[in-house]
Amino acid sequence: MAPSKTYRVKLAGRFWTWCYTRLRGSADGWQHDSKDTVLIHDKLPPQRRMEVDLHEALHCLYPDLSEESVTDGARDLRRLLWLLGYRR
């Protein structure tokens, strides 16, 4: 199935292909470092999508950060941005 939306973004000096597509399994997002690609499930509710976007962006920016730190940081940033009125 082709991605529903694809973007080219630059994070930490690298270009990434950011794709919204149907994902199988339980993960809402994947960051493929060797392919410079991020895949995000295309059917997520807005707040969850924002958090997954932030989560995967943090993986791209800080690859040595622990999964727990990435998860906590993404959740905290999503709460702040949502409170400030940022929406998709």
Q: Language-model segments: which ranges?
A:
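Active-site scaffold of zinc-dependent metalloenzymes
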Residues: A2-Q47, Y62-P63, E67-L81
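Active-site recognition of the HExxH zinc-binding catalytic motif
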Residues: E51-C60
